[in-house]
Amino acid sequence: MSDHEDLNKAMGHWNASESYQLNPASVIVSVVFSLIFLLGTIGNSLVLAVLLRSGQVGYNTTNLFILNLSVADFFFIIFCVPFQATIYSLEGWVFGSFMCKVVHFFINLTMYASSFTLAAVSVDRYLAIRYPLRSRELRTPCNAVVAMVVIWGLSLVFAGPYLSYYDLIDFENSNVCVPGWEEHNRKVLDTCTFVFGYVIPVLIVSLSYTRTIKYLWTAVDPLDGMSESKRAKRKVTKMIIIVTVLFCICWLPYHVVILCYLYGDFPFNQTTYAFRLLSHCMAYANSCLNPIVYALVSKHFRKGFKKVFSCILSKKGRNKVHVVNVANTVPGFEAGSTEVSQMNEENARQNESEMVNRPLAQPQDTTMTITLPFQNQP
């Protein structure tokens, strides 16, 4: 018997027999994966609703990348988590050969899309903070959309081989979804996935945020010191860094387990089974953590959540009169357009100067008529 067949049978035993016999683990897995599915579906749906409802997503590159990340997380939750949960709760794979291939393809597709998006947004934040004026022509919504198309295109290219990577095998009268490629080909593909889907994006993110933090926390604005614009930059950078760190932490054990299968001595026993289960739970939980981070860090996003909930719970909210501070009317992320904040400050100074030199005008009587939105029209 070849090493390839030995590994497939061992993994078949791990996926089917071991998981089915561990009844307590099956119950725990069902609860944990159900919680991940509910939180991820609701959380990412709210993120998408807030961004799309605000109408500002098309004018801000950071919000576009956050939207792209939420779409990737939402697809992962819907197309991957429910099916992967059955590996630990059922005796075998019950969804057929096609879904065996498609589910693992979507796992890697969305993982690539998330890692590439985080790398792109880290570069975007660095340019916005370090070169707010010079980078304005580059950091346009149109270019951000092009970057998103490139991200999904590259993700399709890198994840495409996984459509043929997995196969169904028969093990103890059960169908089990396991890798079907030869060992050498598996090593090449999984190593490339680790390098291009994890290592390189993490290096880009680390370099970008190291330079961003160094500049943001040490640079001194000679005009106004710690301005509102600079505080907003720090807050949104903090939020994106937290999201990125969570991605790195949650996906690292998943890659380590796969590499240990291929290159290390990783016996199939209860301990390694538990570690594999933990690595999957951490990777899948990452897709439901981002909305929680947005809600905890971003004041404007919390307001966006409340507005979405108020629209869902009560249709009468449309007839209410809200007095809102103009500076807080955008329910998106506090990133806003950091360069716009600087331009607003400059315009304010210019307007003050014009007011001083402008001759006084004769007072005139002015009549203002206000029509409330809930008044009956004639």
Curated annotation (Swiss-Prot):
Gene3D superfamilies: Rhodopsin 7-helix transmembrane proteins. InterPro entries: Galanin_rcpt, GPCR_Rhodpsn, GPCR_Rhodpsn_7TM. Residues 339-362 are annotated as: Disordered. It is a multi-pass membrane protein. It is found in: Membrane. Keywords: Disulfide bond, G-protein coupled receptor, Membrane, Receptor, Transducer, Transmembrane, Transmembrane helix. GO terms for biological process: neuropeptide signaling pathway. Expressed in neurons in the ventral area of the interpeduncular nucleus (IPN) where expression often overlaps with spx1. GO terms for cellular component: plasma membrane. The chain crosses the membrane at residues 31-51, 63-83, 102-123, 144-164, 188-208, 239-259, 277-297. Disulfide bonds join C100-C177. Residues 52-62, 124-143, 209-238, 298-378 are cytoplasmic. It holds the Pfam family 7tm_1. Residues 1-30, 84-101, 165-187, 260-276 are extracellular. CDD domains: 7tmA_Gal2_Gal3_R. GO terms for molecular function: G protein-coupled peptide receptor activity; galanin receptor activity. SUPFAM superfamilies: Family A G protein-coupled receptor-like. Receptor for the hormone galanin. Receptor for the hormones spexin-1 and spexin-2. Belongs to the G-protein coupled receptor 1 family. This is Galanin receptor 2b. It comes from Danio rerio (Zebrafish). The lineage of its organism: Eukaryota, Metazoa, Chordata, Craniata, Vertebrata.
